[in-house]
Each structure stands twice: as C-alpha cells, then as structure tokens.
Design a protein with these regions (language model features):
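Secreted/periplasmic carbohydrate-active enzymes, especially glycoside hydrolases
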Residues: 1-192, 196-200, 254, 269-270, ...
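Substrate-binding/catalytic cleft of secreted carbohydrate-active enzymes
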Residues: 167-168, 177-409, 413-422, 430, ...
C-alpha cells in the first residue's frame, strides 16, 4: 500500500483569463483539427487563435470564438503536402499553439500542445475476416500487459528517464502495443508513447465493493468455455462487486473523467471498460457511454469475460486451454496469454512467485516463449487473430511472469529470440491479410 500525492503537481503563474483546458479533435478523413479552448472567465475565448506547425514550419492558422460563450473553437485545415499520418513506424506529431486575448495583458494566455492524424477502424481483409486497421491498413497489434508498478515507488517510477528507457526497450523488442492494466498513468507517460509510436489499450480502473473471488476468478477460469458469455445483469452485480448504486455511479463518473483526461493522446487506440468481470455491470451501457464521449477509438467492452457481445473486440484471455480462433462479427484479440513464470536469481520481487507454468532457467524460458509464439500464436493469425497481449511486461510483487525483472535490470528471455518471434508474426500477418 502507499499514500500521498498521486499524479503530477505543479505551480504556475497564470493571467486572470487563463486557458483551463484544451479539447483537440483531429479528423483523419477530413484532414482537419478542431481546437476548443476552455477559459477561466466567461467570454474569455472570444478571441481564440491557433497555429499548427509541422517540423517548425507554420502550415495552418486561424481565429475563432463566440461572444456569448466562454469556450472558443476553431477548425484548421491540414494542407495535402503536410499530411503525415501517425503510426508506430512514423509517429509524427504536429505542434499546436493556442492563445486567447481580451485586448489587454491581463486577459492574454498562450499554451503549447500537439496532436496527430490517425484513424482506427475494423475492416474485412481479402478473405472477409475483420481486422484492426490503422489509417485504413490492417495492423497486427502485438503487445504486453503493463501494470505500471515500480519497486521504488509502486505507482511512481524513479525518474522520467526510467520511463523512457522502458518504453524504448519495448519498441526495440518489436512490440507496438501496451495494454495499460487497471491504472491511469501521469500524462507524461502517454506523451512518451505518443512520441515513440507505442499504441496503448487503456483499462478503466477497478472499483466497487468486494467481489466473490471464488466465482469471478477460480470458477470462471475453470469453466471459461461455459461461463464466458454469462450476462452481467443485476442478479450478478453482488458477485462482481457492484451491488450498491453509489459504486455504479462512481464508475460512470470515473469513466467520463478518464476519457476527458486522456482523449487528446494519439497513442490511445482502445478503451477497455471492464477486465475479467472485476466490478463489471451493464457493459453495453458502458460502451454506449464511451461512444458518446469518444467515437474515434476502438472499445474492448469486456476483456476476457463476461462478454456481452458489444464493442469492437472479441476479447479472449487464454492461459489453460487450446487456442481456437473463429472469426465472427467482431475483431478477435487475445488480450491476455502466456505468463510463463521464472524467478530470475538475484532479481526476485518480494512475495509469492505466481505465474502460468514455471521455467527452469533462461534457456528454458526462451524455449517456452518461442514455442508459444511459433506453435500456438502464429497459426491463428490466418484464422482471424488480430491482436495479442503477452502477460506481462515486468515482474511485479507476487508475480514473476514478466519479460523483464521487477527492478528492470534484466530481460529474462533472450532478446534476439523475442525480436525474431515478433518479426515472424508481423511477416505472417502481412501475408495472410494481403489483397
């Protein structure tokens, strides 16, 4: 457990009429960006202006605002010659400067931000199988589960440099995705993902009361093929920890706050409202709320179980059963798998050593990892598997199934083997989705 200040805190001198918030909405198809400024004083954004730069060159600028509204809005067109879509291979960010003024120094404020042009969709490949598409092209989303714990500060990393180093290592191994598991990171973490071209699937934070661990975790895992589609209706809410109206209202409030806080980060490609039934209730309503807040991203309505058939993702967790992918009306993701444990000598985290099968040493872990990728994952790509999330990025307290040790000092399997597997998966996916 930990206590104290969470997230970033700073002091800043601002004018009386300062910009409190920006809402930046890029439109990939229209090649525009709409900027809305919220200000401290009524009518404070009536003389809103915005400038877009690409590589230091001004490519668009405009004025806007509304005399009767404190929230001004401008839409800027991106010229054809400066249209640079964002992707993991080319994470181009446009610089954005926004200002407001009421004609005097006290009413003047300027902020600097950025945005990207990119588009998520689910579209059929040449065989009619739905695939995740980025900017209209099929993309294999290949990533790691990231719980975001650090030995030095649990939720808090030791430094910004440590965060960047970890994210760079993920990219160097050939992954393009992190599933941020039940944690909201400081904005700077997402900024680095934006810059590096790492896609993020963002879980909502767990909540509610005490759930029935025996039912939600043990029984459902044991009988997953039978219970995966259990309705999350009112009779189940007590078992899932959502019996009280207050806890359900709290979830809805936090869902909205999470989207509003993170929606301007281009790295986020998918919202995950529920994971493995933890605090789940009325998942279809959560999806509808997310669509109303942000219709530019994918939604993994219920990661693992209890699947209500909504959202964009047929989301599977599989640690124990033979993997059989059958394409249907949603795009298929293996949103948790693997989890091979090995407590690396000299780097063991405190507590128990939990995982899904235990390797004997580095060579055995590498062998098991390669076999899993080549024998289990690769054959399923042609059958519709379009995203995969290995458990997990690092060891954490009580869990030793990370690719990296908890102290981030060592990669447990051989790096060359991980890179080779990822390259093979990417090549196979390109082959099976080619038109």
């Amino acid at each position: 457990a930990q206590s104290g200040i969470w997230q970033t805190v700073w002091l800043e001198r601002v004018p009386d009429n300062y910009i409190t918030e920006l809402t930046v909405t890029p439109d990939y198809d229209a090649r525009t960006v709409t900027v809305k400024a919220h200000t401290a004083q009524p009518g404070g954004a009536k003389n809103l202006w915005a400038v877009v730069r690409a590589g230091g060159v001004t490519i668009a600028e405009d004025w806007g605002g509304d005399e009767a509204d404190q929230d001004g809005e401008v839409t800027l067109n991106i010229p054809e010659e400066h249209f640079f879509p964002w992707s993991p291979d080319s994470p181009f960010l446009y610089d954005l400067t926004v200002g407001t003024t009421q004609g005097d120094e006290d009413g003047f404020d300027t902020v600097h931000s950025y945005f990207a042009l990119r588009k998520w969709s689910c579209e059929p490949d040449a065989k009619g199988i739905l695939r995740f598409c980025l900017n209209g092209k099929p993309i294999l989303l290949n990533g790691l589960l990231d719980q975001g714990y650090w030995p030095e500060g649990l939720y808090t990393p030791p430094s910004d440099a440590a965060v960047v180093h970890e994210l760079e290592q993920v990219k160097e191994l050939g992954f393009n995705l992190l599933r941020k598991h039940a944690k909201i990171e400081p904005q700077r973490w997402y900024y680095h993902c934006d810059k590096l071209g790492l896609i993020v699937w963002q879980d909502m934070v767990n909540g509610g009361g005490k759930m029935n661990q025996w039912y939600v975790t043990y029984l459902t895992n044991a009988l997953l093929p039978l219970l995966r589609h259990t309705p999350d209706a009112k009779p189940l809410w007590g078992l899932l920890g959502r019996e009280t109206e207050a806890s359900r209202e709290s979830y809805q409030t936090e869902l909205k706050a999470t989207v509003e806080a993170l929606r301007c980060h281009p790295c986020i490609g998918c919202w995950v409202p529920f994971n493995e039934g933890w605090g789940q209730f009325d998942a279809r309503a959560a999806t509808a709320a997310l669509r109303a807040l942000d219709d530019t991203r994918l939604i993994d309505e219920a990661s693992g179980w209890y699947d209500q058939g909504g959202g964009d993702v047929d989301s599977r967790h599989n640690y124990f059963y033979p993997l059989r992918i059958r394409p249907g009306g949603r795009t298929v993701a293996l949103s948790e798998y693997g989890g091979i444990a090995w407590p690396m000598p000299g780097h063991e985290p405190p507590g128990k050593t939990y995982g899904y099968g235990t390797a004997k040493d580095k060579a055995d872990l590498t062998k098991r990892y390669k076999m899993l990728q080549w024998k289990t994952i690769l054959p399923q790509l042609g059958r519709g598997l379009s995203a995969l999330v290995y458990t997990q990025l690092t060891d954490v307290e009580d869990e030793v199934n990370g690719l990296f040790t908890y102290d981030r000092a060592a990669l447990k399997p051989e790096a060359a083997a991980v890179r080779s597997c990822n390259a093979a998966l990417a090549a196979e996916f390109a082959k099976v989705t080619a038109k």
